Design a protein with these regions (language model features):
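Charged, amphipathic alpha-helical segments and their flanking helix caps
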Residues: 1, 104, 157-158
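Solvent-exposed edge beta-strands and adjacent loop segments
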Residues: 2-81, 116-139, 146-147
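Short, flexible coil/linker elements and helix-boundary hinge sites characteristic
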Residues: 16, 88-89, 152
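Short, acidic/charged, Gly/Pro-enriched secondary-structure junctions
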Residues: 82-113
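Edge beta-strand at a domain terminus
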Residues: 138-140, 155-156
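Short acidic DE-rich linear segments
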Residues: 149-158
Length: 158
């Protein structure tokens, strides 16, 4: 009986070992106030009837990219974008770059750039007399993304 190969615990990526930068109109901001961020690509599929089969096939016909972030309520960068839209009607798109790298892991780092992101909504103002700290959530869409750096394969994967 062969020995089962398992993942080395050090290759589990620490959840907080990341960098996040936002680029708006050529200005690059260190988005260190981010608490979490997640972006995903959802494929659009159509059911395709196939003669001679009782099951339908599924064909990918497109996709959309959405994301969400939670960050500390200590920056006005995104409120400025909302205010600018309110005042001028100009909707500003921006890029988000996320690098995930845990120095303990052997997989190295991964860098993704979310391109042409656009906020769905945003907090204008906020307080909480009973809270510990203030944070805010932001949902957004993206037009594209790029995998700039990818993780190395975990030892034993192949």
């Amino acid at each position: 009986m062969s020995k089962n190969v398992t993942m080395n615990v050090r290759d589990a990526i620490s959840a907080s070992e990341a960098e996040c930068f936002v680029t708006i109109e050529g200005k690059r901001y260190n988005f260190m106030s981010a608490i979490n961020l997640e972006a995903k690509m959802e494929k659009t599929k159509s059911e395709i009837p196939i003669l001679g089969r009782t099951t339908k096939g599924n064909k990918t016909t497109g996709s959309k990219i959405t994301g969400s972030a939670t960050f500390h309520f200590n920056t006005s960068i995104f409120r400025e974008l909302l205010y600018r839209y309110k005042e001028t009607g100009e909707d500003i798109y921006f890029d988000i770059q996320v690098t995930t790298e845990d120095p303990t892991s052997s997989v190295g780092r991964q860098t993704v750039i979310l391109k042409d992101c656009n906020m769905d909504s945003g907090i204008i103002t906020k307080f909480d007399a009973d809270g510990e700290y203030l944070d805010e959530d932001m949902d957004f869409t993206c037009e594209d993304w790029e995998l700039v750096e990818k993780f190395n394969l975990i030892s034993g994967t192949m």
